[in-house]
């Protein structure tokens, strides 16, 4: 059984973290938490 290289482990870890942050951002923008977000364009009076 071969052991994986440290570089591969670090690359996979970084990939998982980036995918997690992206998923969290999409969930915050389009999921249930988006009701708490304010739209500055709607708040601006012309």
Swiss-Prot record:
<keyword id="KW-0472">Membrane</keyword>
<protein>
    <recommendedName>
        <fullName>Protein PsbN</fullName>
    </recommendedName>
</protein>
<dbReference type="GO" id="GO:0015979">
    <property type="term" value="P:photosynthesis"/>
</dbReference>
<comment type="similarity">
    <text>Belongs to the PsbN family.</text>
</comment>
<keyword id="KW-0793">Thylakoid</keyword>
<comment type="function">
    <text>May play a role in photosystem I and II biogenesis.</text>
</comment>
<dbReference type="Pfam" id="PF02468">
    <property type="entry name" value="PsbN"/>
</dbReference>
<keyword id="KW-1133">Transmembrane helix</keyword>
<feature type="transmembrane region" description="Helical">
    <location>
        <begin position="10"/>
        <end position="30"/>
    </location>
</feature>
<keyword id="KW-0812">Transmembrane</keyword>
<dbReference type="GO" id="GO:0031676">
    <property type="term" value="C:plasma membrane-derived thylakoid membrane"/>
</dbReference>
<dbReference type="InterPro" id="IPR003398">
    <property type="entry name" value="PSII_PsbN"/>
</dbReference>
């Amino acid at each position: 059984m071969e052991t994986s290289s440290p570089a591969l482990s670090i690359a996979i870890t970084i990939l998982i973290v980036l995918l997690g942050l992206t998923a969290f951002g999409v969930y915050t923008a389009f999921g249930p938490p988006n009701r708490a977000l304010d739209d500055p364009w709607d708040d601006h009076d012309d």
